[in-house]
Amino acid sequence: MNTFGREFRITTFGESHGKAVGVVVDGVPAGLPLSEEDVKRELERRMFCHIPVLNPRCEPEEFEILSGVKEGRTQGTPIAIVIWNRKVISSYYEELWLKPRPGHADLAYYLKYGINYDHRGGGRASGRTTAAIVAAGAVAKAVLRHVGVEVLGHVVELGGVEISATYTVDDVRKSWEKPLPVVDDAALEKMVEKIREAVLRGDSIGGGVEVWALGVPPGLGEPHFGKIKADLAKAAFSIPGVVAFEWGAGRALAKMFGSEANDPITVVNGRPALATNRAGGLLGGITVGAPLYFRAWFKPTPSVRKPQQTVDLGKMEPTTLEFKGRYDVTIVPKALVALEAITAVVLADHVLRAGIIRRDRPISGSLV
């Protein structure tokens, strides 16, 4: 399926080397402030063009908002955003037509669709398609700003190098002023060295990120299959390359006694609140007013220059593949922006489901 969400719904489309990728966002109330600059800002955060090995394609992200927005405000109708694919070199992929790349979706798509799929640049399974999710996230973040919710993230691991410094939310915000959004300067230096090493080896590296949501009102989420973390886990695994997901203190809780794992409950400003937040802002999958946070990990980019064993599907015999096209030495920084975006989409959906914002009422501009 290419559609996600219940009240705030997104439908993405497009392939890596097609004319464009894009998204249709439905469920946005009328009167919400939304500009092209909002979308441009999020798309540019994803690019990392100042580090060419992280984004050798580095497209300028030419996009258009085709519908649903007029004079800087939403119309309450579907918002269609198209992002044109410009820097496409499909010749690299001619020899890959019948040689599926190990670790990529090529083999799975061949087994499911036969020859009826676009393999160039990874096609529908490419990280390029996350540009559409980031555009949808720009709309979702506009919805969340209206209710005081902020979504932000940072890199916590890259190429086996993990951050070790303690940090605050403000440190996470400031990390985006660095070459990579990493709060720990010593770890950042080692991560850059790992990137250089991978480039010299003709290889790639994976890593992990952490995403926070601040100002989330209590009461979002529903029992069992409507839990916030269930929806966010599904959303996270929809981002290409995600291999693991951890909510709150995650695995560390499994090593504690219950008395250590539980967050004490106290009173803040006359309301019950968590004294600590090992639970990641959720109890029973429902928000309690504390910050939400989770971590996700990405495998190394499957496309590498080192020779790899595969199969020639035309001859049905083993062969060796040496990839000659452009590839990202790591997708982690760009994928972080996509994870922020899909987190915003999930939370915007739950804000609408809870009735905090009504789809059938304009946010502003009403004459009655």
UniProtKB/Swiss-Prot annotation:
<feature type="binding site">
    <location>
        <position position="284"/>
    </location>
    <ligand>
        <name>FMN</name>
    </ligand>
</feature>
<protein>
    <recommendedName>
        <fullName>Chorismate synthase</fullName>
        <ecNumber>4.2.3.5</ecNumber>
    </recommendedName>
</protein>
<keyword id="KW-0057">Aromatic amino acid biosynthesis</keyword>
<keyword id="KW-0288">FMN</keyword>
<keyword id="KW-0274">FAD</keyword>
<dbReference type="GO" id="GO:0009423">
    <property type="term" value="P:chorismate biosynthetic process"/>
</dbReference>
<dbReference type="Pfam" id="PF01264">
    <property type="entry name" value="Chorismate_synt"/>
</dbReference>
<dbReference type="InterPro" id="IPR020541">
    <property type="entry name" value="Chorismate_synthase_CS"/>
</dbReference>
<dbReference type="GO" id="GO:0005829">
    <property type="term" value="C:cytosol"/>
</dbReference>
<dbReference type="InterPro" id="IPR035904">
    <property type="entry name" value="Chorismate_synth_AroC_sf"/>
</dbReference>
<keyword id="KW-0285">Flavoprotein</keyword>
<feature type="binding site">
    <location>
        <begin position="299"/>
        <end position="303"/>
    </location>
    <ligand>
        <name>FMN</name>
    </ligand>
</feature>
<dbReference type="GO" id="GO:0004107">
    <property type="term" value="F:chorismate synthase activity"/>
</dbReference>
<keyword id="KW-0456">Lyase</keyword>
<comment type="function">
    <text>This reaction introduces a second double bond into the aromatic ring system.</text>
</comment>
<dbReference type="InterPro" id="IPR000453">
    <property type="entry name" value="Chorismate_synth"/>
</dbReference>
<keyword id="KW-0521">NADP</keyword>
<comment type="similarity">
    <text>Belongs to the chorismate synthase family.</text>
</comment>
<feature type="binding site">
    <location>
        <position position="46"/>
    </location>
    <ligand>
        <name>NADP(+)</name>
    </ligand>
</feature>
<comment type="pathway">
    <text>Metabolic intermediate biosynthesis; chorismate biosynthesis; chorismate from D-erythrose 4-phosphate and phosphoenolpyruvate: step 7/7.</text>
</comment>
<feature type="binding site">
    <location>
        <begin position="124"/>
        <end position="126"/>
    </location>
    <ligand>
        <name>FMN</name>
    </ligand>
</feature>
<dbReference type="GO" id="GO:0009073">
    <property type="term" value="P:aromatic amino acid family biosynthetic process"/>
</dbReference>
<feature type="binding site">
    <location>
        <position position="326"/>
    </location>
    <ligand>
        <name>FMN</name>
    </ligand>
</feature>
<dbReference type="GO" id="GO:0010181">
    <property type="term" value="F:FMN binding"/>
</dbReference>
<keyword id="KW-0028">Amino-acid biosynthesis</keyword>
<dbReference type="GO" id="GO:0008652">
    <property type="term" value="P:amino acid biosynthetic process"/>
</dbReference>
